[in-house]
Design a protein with these regions (language model features):
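A cross-family phosphate/adenosyl-ligand binding-site feature
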Residues: 1-128, 136-202
């Protein structure tokens, strides 16, 4: 399974961490691309260091949570397979997805490889999952999310549930990550599902 994980400048890097780890454990062929703002978010939210070089943060992030085969793609490296519809990509996940990136994708514009890959998935009618993390939402945000959904994307907002009685922040992260993985057909259980009493190992 070929998957691209795009990381933009919205808060929510821990979700990307859990998704990358699960995909790697599942044996997926994963490529990671982070925008400049996304790299800064990783440095702050994963490593707690605002001054950390974004490139170093991304490399450490992939080394810590990916597999040895996980590849980092530069923000504007359009030689990546995800940049063309002729190279079949099973899923593109943009997590976290900023509202600026949502607007760019909806407009059919391309400021980086993440936007290009998302556009390719839409035109080829393949799986695109975006995980927005913003509040409150303006009418522009809501309209853009609706347009993106109508274009074929799965919109999985970073809204964790509480019916599984989470005990830690990681439990909340796992709920959202699990819904993303469900959306692309990866059969792992990161959280207790409704009606189930036990959680299987990821």
């Amino acid at each position: 399974m070929r998957v691209m994980l795009g990381i933009t400048g919205a808060s929510g890097a821990p979700y990307a961490t859990r998704i990358l780890r699960a995909l790697s454990d599942h044996g997926a062929d994963v490529g990671v691309c982070a925008s400049a703002a996304g790299r800064q978010v990783i440095a702050l939210e994963i490593y707690g260091d605002r001054g950390m070089d974004g490139g170093d943060a991304l490399e450490r992030f992939v080394a810590d949570h990916g597999s040895p085969d996980t590849r980092i793609w530069a923000e504007r490296d359009y030689s990546a397979p995800y940049a063309s519809g002729s190279s079949r990509t099973d899923a593109v996940i943009v997590c976290p997805c900023s509202m600026a990136s949502i607007g760019t994708i909806v407009a059919g514009a391309e400021a980086n490889l993440i936007h290009r890959a998302a556009g390719v998935q839409l035109k080829e009618r393949r799986k695109l999952v975006v995980v927005p993390r913003e509040t409150p939402l303006s009418s522009i945000h809501l309209e853009n999310l609706l347009r993106l959904r109508n274009a074929g994307a799965d919109v999985i907002a970073a809204m964790p549930a509480f019916y599984h009685l989470p005990q830690t922040i990681d439990d909340l992260v796992a709920f959202v990550a699990g819904r993303v993985l469900d959306s692309i057909g990866v059969d792992v259980t990161l959280h207790e599902r409704w009606g189930e009493s036990q959680v299987g190992a990821p």
